[in-house]
């Protein structure tokens, strides 16, 4: 065998034997060391072929080409006569990737970053890439204040040139801010300035926003906050000269020093507008009428620029440019604003498209649009469409994207990107309660039936005191103009005594239909007719009930527990809704007012009217709408007509998960006062009167309920599920009273309270958790009553399916 001659030893050290200008002719090419890489693939990557005449430069190019494939750790090229011998050492293949000690960074995020760098199972391992990854991860930990963190890649060899890759993390602890110093401030104290920061050197227990853990990004945000603080107060020459971040020797403490130059306060001397105003100069100038002599404010300048862009957007100018150049006069300490506007091109809307509506039909979304295809683009109309889609309650999120049409100077497509939520619920349950006994419940509710926008519900309940079934359907677009049509049929067999209410049994059935007429974007009127048949029996004589029977001329015995009667009522139902909520479920901003009423019409056995008013207002505290104040009220009033009274089975009740939490359902308000004295089993035997009080709720013809809530971010819930879970702390108050109650001497002697007094208000406070689960909305609450009266029953923990607020 001829002596082999070493041409190239490694990538880093290049030494080759010089064969002269003519080189030699390659008769054959052999490889040594190939395992995973095929010979054909290696040959294709080489610039040298059999029959080529090669020299030193060709050999160097060959080695570079083989290294460039990323498959080899080492490459040697030798000559054996006229044969080119290529010796390679393949990079090992990654058999598995594991992580240890990482708490701040999740495994999924690490895998994504590794794959972006080409490090994945089945690929060859590049050790230089690992070094970059180690350094990048350590830099990340440093940016969040963990300066003692380290990341090491442990490579374990396996048979067949494979390796296990393990990233071992030692995260350490976050460095805490020991002190923040601001140098150069004279107009404002350091404490005053630091109070606007997220980073703090001292954080009181009640401050859930402040943080002593150092983070580079938060510091950058705080410096911008500091800059805005001064610019908004007239300091047009304010400057942050330098920022020093010092680390204690143990890497657990941080000292931050910010050096600033405040400068003087400047006042506005005027505003000058120029440029392409697209014929809207008067409207634009009205937006720039800042008062000369007022302090210069960066926030007002930004608001002015946004207002001009929004105005032009309404007229179809989708991409206007507005630039404000402050002209500072240091002599008289004034600033003149020179506003340059370029409206740009005016755009038509070519198409409106929807993405993400896998269930909802395109037509269901399109009918909510106020922007039309083929018309001038109007940003306000596009936003109105987004608002209407949000209020449907079908979607978790709705985003808009205005996209230019390729090759067209004046056309755009408007794209609505939605993320659908589960708008239906199915529940089947078997339970046992001290009041209800064995309980069966089944229900199906779908607010977007088969993607058509129809709302369909089938519900049923069976327990010791109630058998209830209902079918309802609503078409929100019965006509193309948005007139809705809804209907309902129901059957209810209700034993009030077993439900801890006044003693009677009512078997009822009925139906109703309602038309809804949109008045404008936010107001809807409703009108409809209803029929209900009530068959009452087993009525134990009690004062409020007998008062009603007397008013309708119905004779009843005070000595019998088996009184009964039947009534057929026809009602005219009406209502009004004002809705400016930002979303159909879990709103964070806006208000909703809902007024409902009904009155009997001629042909009815009863004559009465009934009104309920529900209000809800949401006030976001922060820009992200994660902290929200919610105020709710519910008012109700009803009475008889023509000298008659409101039927007792139409009374209002309060207490329970949807009114005053912490109290048993329907337990707040007047209680039944029975005739017959102490012979009744459910009487409170406190006197020898002919009547006796009880703890059985009977309700009243008037009701008032109010609630104040603080909605907060839910702990331990990732952003992915933040839109599906809501936590709140609440204070509830409410009362029910009877305006027709007469607190006679007989009642006082029996120890009966004055049920006509509306001031007997119950109160409670607690915490609630709402979850939009796959089965429908689930609501859990824990409340403690702190103002209650005799006969009230507490129920601290409550659970409800199918209602959110």
UniProtKB/Swiss-Prot annotation:
It comes from the Bacteria. Keywords: Cell outer membrane, Membrane, Repeat, Signal, Transmembrane, Transmembrane beta strand. It is found in: Cell outer membrane. One of its GO terms (cellular component) is Bam protein complex. Pfam families: Omp85, POTRA. Its main location: membrane. GO terms for biological process: Gram-negative-bacterium-type cell outer membrane assembly; protein insertion into membrane. Residues 1-20 form the signal peptide. InterPro entries: Bac_surfAg_D15 (IPR000184), BamA/TamA_POTRA (IPR010827), D15-like (IPR039910), OM_assembly_BamA (IPR023707), POTRA (IPR034746). Residues 24-91, 92-172, 175-263, 266-344, 347-421 form the POTRA domain. Part of the outer membrane protein assembly complex, which is involved in assembly and insertion of beta-barrel proteins into the outer membrane. Constitutes, with BamD, the core component of the assembly machinery. Belongs to the BamA family. Part of the Bam complex, which is composed of the outer membrane protein BamA, and four lipoproteins BamB, BamC, BamD and BamE. This is Outer membrane protein assembly factor BamA. The gene is bamA.
């Amino acid at each position: 065998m001829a002596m082999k001659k070493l041409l190239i030893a490694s990538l880093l050290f290049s030494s080759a034997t010089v064969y002269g200008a003519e080189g030699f002719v390659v008769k054959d090419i052999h490889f040594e060391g190939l395992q995973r890489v095929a010979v054909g693939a290696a040959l294709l990557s080489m610039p040298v072929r059999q029959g080529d005449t090669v020299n030193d430069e060709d050999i160097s190019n060959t080695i570079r080409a083989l290294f460039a494939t990323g498959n080899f750790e080492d490459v040697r090229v030798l000559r054996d006569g006229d044969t080119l011998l290529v010796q390679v050492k393949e990079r090992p293949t990654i058999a598995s990737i594991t992580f240890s000690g990482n708490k701040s960074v999740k495994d999924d995020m690490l895998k994504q970053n590794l794959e972006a760098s080409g490090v994945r199972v089945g690929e060859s391992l590049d050790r230089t890439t690992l070094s970059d990854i180690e350094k990048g991860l350590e830099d990340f930990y440093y940016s969040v204040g963990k300066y003692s963190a380290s990341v090491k890649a442990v490579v374990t060899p396996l048979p067949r040139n494979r390796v296990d890759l393990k990233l071992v993390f030692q995260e350490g602890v976050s460095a805490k801010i020991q002190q923040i110093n601001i140098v150069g401030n004279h107009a404002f104290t350091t404490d005053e300035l630091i109070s606007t920061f997220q980073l703090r050197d001292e954080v009181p227990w009640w401050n859930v926003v402040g943080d002593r853990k150092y983070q580079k990004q938060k510091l950058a945000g705080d410096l911008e906050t500091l800059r805005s603080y001064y610019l908004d107060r007239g300091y047009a020459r304010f400057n942050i000269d330098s920022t020093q971040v010092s680390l204690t020797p143990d890497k657990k403490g941080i000292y931050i020093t910010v050096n600033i130059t405040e400068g003087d306060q400047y006042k506005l001397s005027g505003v000058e507008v120029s440029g392409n105003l697209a014929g809207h100069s008067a409207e634009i100038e009205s937006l720039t009428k800042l008062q000369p002599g007022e302090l210069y404010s960066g926030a007002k300048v930004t608001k002015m620029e946004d207002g001009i862009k929004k105005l032009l957007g309404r007229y179809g100018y989708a991409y206007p440019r507005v630039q404000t150049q402050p002209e500072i006069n240091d002599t008289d300490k004034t600033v003149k604003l020179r506003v340059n506007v370029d409206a740009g091109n005016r755009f038509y809307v070519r198409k409106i498209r929807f993405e993400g509506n896998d269930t909802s039909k395109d037509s269901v979304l399109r009918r909510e649009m106020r922007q039309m295809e083929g018309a001038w683009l109007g940003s306000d109309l596009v936003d109105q469409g987004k608002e209407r889609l949000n209020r449907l309650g079908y979607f978790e999120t709705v985003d808009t994207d205005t996209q230019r049409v390729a090759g067209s100077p004046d056309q755009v497509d408007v794209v609505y990107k939605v993320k659908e939520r589960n708008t239906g619920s199915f529940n089947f349950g078997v339970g046992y309660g001290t009041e209800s006994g064995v309980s069966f419940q089944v229900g199906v509710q779908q607010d977007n039936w088969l993607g058509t926008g129809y709302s369909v519900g089938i519900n049923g309940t069976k327990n010791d005191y109630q058998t209830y079934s209902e079918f309802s359907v609503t078409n929100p677009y019965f006509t193309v103009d948005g007139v809705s049509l809804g209907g309902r049929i129901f059957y209810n067999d209700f034993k009030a005594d077993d439900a801890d209410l006044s003693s009677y049994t009512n078997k009822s059935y009925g139906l109703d239909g309602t038309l809804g007429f949109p008045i404008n974007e936010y107001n809807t009127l409703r009108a409809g007719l209803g029929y209900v048949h009530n068959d009452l029996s087993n009525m134990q004589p009690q004062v409020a009930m007998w008062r009603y029977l007397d008013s309708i001329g119905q004779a009843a015995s005070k000595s019998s527990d088996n009184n009964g009667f039947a009534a057929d009522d026809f009602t005219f139902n009406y209502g009004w809704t004002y809705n400016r909520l930002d979303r159909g479920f879990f709103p964070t901003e806006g208000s909703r007012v809902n007024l409902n009423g009904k009155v009997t019409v001629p042909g009815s056995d009863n004559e009465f009217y009934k009104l309920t008013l529900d209000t809800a207002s949401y006030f976001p505290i922060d820009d992200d709408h994660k902290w929200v104040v919610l105020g709710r009220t519910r008012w109700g009033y009803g009475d008889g007509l023509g000298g008659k009274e409101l039927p007792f089975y139409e009374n209002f009740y309060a207490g329970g998960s949807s009114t005053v939490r912490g109290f048993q359902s329907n337990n707040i308000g007047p209680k039944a006062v029975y005739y017959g004295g102490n012979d009744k089993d459910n009487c409170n035997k406190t006197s020898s009167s002919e009547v006796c009080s009880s703890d059985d709720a009977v309700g009243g013809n008037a009701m008032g309920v109010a609630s104040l809530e603080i909605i907060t971010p839910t702990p331990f819930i990732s952003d992915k599920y933040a839109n599906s879970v809501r936590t709140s702390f609440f204070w509830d108050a409410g009362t029910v009273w009877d305006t027709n109650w007469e607190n006679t001497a007989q009642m006082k002697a029996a120890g009966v309270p004055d049920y006509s007094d509306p001031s007997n208000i119950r109160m409670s406070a607690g915490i609630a958790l709402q979850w939009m689960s796959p089965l429908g909305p689930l609501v859990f609450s824990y409340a403690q009553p702190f103002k209650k009266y005799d006969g009230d029953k507490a129920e601290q923990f409550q659970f409800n399916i199918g209602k959110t607020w």
